[in-house]
């Protein structure tokens, strides 16, 4: 079986004789993605349940000066304490996604923000003059994990954004930010449906793979379901 849990984002459809290699490039969320794959939520849930974890007190106002409070540390689960009372609690923190050194200025990356409740989230530019729309939002359900929803945004590296929460009746929101491309997997075409994939035809994605693609790449005859490892290979 060949799969990468830490690679770059987007889907690559390639046919070749050599095993696929990890690709490193800044990539936005691929077109046609309707849901992130389970391993992305599982990764974030690991941090929810095992840390590292930090708590920050959100600013009561938007467009605040300085860099804090922020949730800039990736692979970290944050509890963001909101301000106000009743159903009018709000809060703002900053987020500055990293740019990989090899990428050019202005490179965008898909970032997934997993949260533990339905507190509204709006992503804005640092000065508050523009709002960034999510390219994907869907519910999350992982056994033993508090996460309930995820939204994905294409964000420019080394650029500061505001995350504006509320209004809500929740006193806090748990949130984990992950760069989607870091959590891609290789999936291999399983044309004969035997559960074993063709190592020469694959897709690299952090999204739910298309039908008839599997993580296993050990089929020696993908046109005959009776021939596979343990049965003729």
Predicted regions span which residues?
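Bacterial signal peptide processing site
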Residues: 10-13
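C-terminal edge strands of extracellular/lumenal beta-sandwich accessory domains
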Residues: 15-17, 27-57, 96-99, 125-134, ...
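Transition segment at domain starts
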Residues: 40-85
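Non-catalytic, beta-strand-enriched accessory regions in extracellular/secretory proteins
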Residues: 67-106, 110-111, 146-153
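Non-cytosolic beta-sheet module surface loops
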Residues: 113-117, 165-167
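Surface-exposed beta-strand/loop patches in noncatalytic accessory domains
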Residues: 118-146
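Membrane-associated feature with strongest affinity for ZDHHC
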Residues: 184-233
């Amino acid at each position: 079986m060949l799969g990468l849990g830490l690679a770059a984002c987007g889907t690559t459809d390639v046919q070749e004789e050599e095993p696929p290699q990890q690709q490193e490039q800044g990539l936005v969320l691929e077109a046609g993605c309707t849901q992130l794959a389970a391993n992305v939520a599982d990764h974030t849930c690991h941090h929810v349940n095992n840390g590292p974890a930090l708590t920050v007190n959100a600013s009561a106002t938007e467009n605040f000066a300085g860099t804090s409070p922020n949730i800039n540390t990736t692979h970290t689960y944050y509890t963001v304490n909101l301000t106000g009372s009743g159903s009018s609690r709000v809060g703002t923190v900053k987020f500055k996604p990293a740019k990989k050194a090899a990428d050019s200025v202005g490179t965008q990356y898909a970032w997934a923000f997993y949260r533990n409740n339905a507190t509204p989230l709006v992503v804005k530019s640092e000065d508050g003059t523009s709002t960034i729309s999510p390219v994907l939002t869907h519910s999350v359900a992982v056994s033993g994990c508090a996460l309930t929803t995820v939204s994905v945004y294409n964000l420019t590296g080394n650029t500061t954004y505001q995350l504006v929460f509320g209004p809500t009746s929740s006193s806090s929101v748990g949130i984990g930010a992950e760069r989607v491309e870091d959590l891609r997997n290789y999936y291999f075409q399983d044309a004969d449906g035997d559960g074993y994939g063709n190592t020469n035809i694959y897709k690299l994605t952090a999204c739910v793979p298309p039908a008839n693609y599997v993580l296993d790449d050990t089929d020696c005859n993908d046109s005959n379901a009776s021939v596979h490892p343990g049965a003729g290979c």
